[in-house]
């Protein structure tokens, strides 16, 4: 499975804006083999990347999206039979997995005229051995506890942690809220995401991870923070080094 595969050099409609941090390039798509499905959370440029989808569309068996987002995929050449759209709380199964589109406090749109035209979501991915949560983007709210009550606990929870500002609290969490949200859903192992690749907010590069780490220690939450491309065994995770201090 790939979730929000953003494997290009820029996360905006204009290439010279929002370039990747120089410390780590994206994993080349040609090196990613045996892709069964892609799960998408919403249609913003840093999550739904046109060049990545073009390279993936003929190598992926199926795409799972919130309501309306499939229209982008179809216009980019993805066959309609390979797209499943789900509303919040809708469930489907795929290759032994239960997939559930869940609420998130965010918004959508790739331009001035299409805001709120497609849905956004967080995702539950439940298999025989592991239960996983992906927060997507969004502000903190009671929906996290509701998701945890319905589908938790989760062996692994990937929590948005980056590209925030106090003025954007309704649509992006602060790092401390990200940890709390991970605990609200019942996450046993938390991983901060959305912080290490692009700069889309005025905070420093390491502010998200340092604050997430500090709050996790205060709340006794188990976390990992692997470098891009690192393989992780969520059943027996190795302690993650503070690799960001080397850059």
Enumerate the language-model features and the residues they cover.
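Metal-dependent catalytic neighborhoods of phosphoester/phosphodiester hydrolases
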Residues: 49-58, 200-210, 235-236
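Glycine/Thr-rich phosphate-binding loops of Rossmann-like dinucleotide-binding domains
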Residues: 11, 48, 73, 109, ...
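Divalent metal-coordination and catalytic microenvironments
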Residues: 4, 42, 49, 99, ...
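Short hydrophobic/aromatic-enriched beta-strand-loop microsegments
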Residues: 3, 64, 80-88, 155-160
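Pre-active-site segment of Zn-dependent metallo-hydrolases
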Residues: 1-43, 50-55, 65-68, 109-115, ...
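Metallo-beta-lactamase
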Residues: 66-130, 211-231, 235-238
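Cap/insert and terminal regions of metallo-dependent hydrolase folds
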Residues: 32, 37, 62-71, 131, ...
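A short C-terminal boundary segment appended to hydrolase-like catalytic domains
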Residues: 235-247
């Amino acid at each position: 499975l790939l979730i929000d595969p953003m494997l290009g050099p820029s996360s905006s409609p204009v290439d010279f804006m929002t370039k990747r941090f120089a410390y780590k390039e994206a994993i080349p798509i040609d090196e990613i083999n045996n892709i069964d499905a892609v799960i998408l959370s919403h249609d913003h440029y840093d999550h739904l990347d046109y060049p990545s989808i073009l390279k993936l569309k003929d190598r992926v068996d199926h795409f799972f999206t919130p309501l309306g987002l499939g229209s982008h995929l179809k216009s980019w050449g993805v066959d309609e039979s390979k797209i499943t759209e789900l509303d919040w709380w809708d469930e489907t199964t795929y290759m032994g997995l239960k997939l559930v589109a869940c609420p998130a406090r965010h918004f959508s749109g790739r331009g001035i005229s299409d805001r709120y035209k497609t849905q956004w979501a967080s995702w539950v991915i439940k298999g025989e051995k592991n239960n996983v949560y992906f927060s997507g983007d969004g502000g903190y709210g009671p929906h996290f506890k509701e998701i945890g009550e319905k589908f938790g606990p989760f062996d692994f929870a990937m929590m948005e942690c980056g590209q925030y500002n106090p003025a954007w609290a309704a649509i992006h969490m602060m790092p401390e809220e990200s940890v709390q949200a991970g605990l609200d859903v019942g996450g046993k192992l938390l991983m901060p995401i959305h912080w290490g690749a692009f700069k889309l907010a005025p905070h420093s590069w390491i502010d998200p991870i340092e604050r997430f780490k500090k709050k996790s220690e205060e709340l006794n939450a188990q976390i990992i923070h692997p470098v891009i491309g690192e393989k992780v065994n969520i059943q027996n995770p190795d302690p993650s080094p503070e690799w960001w201090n080397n850059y």
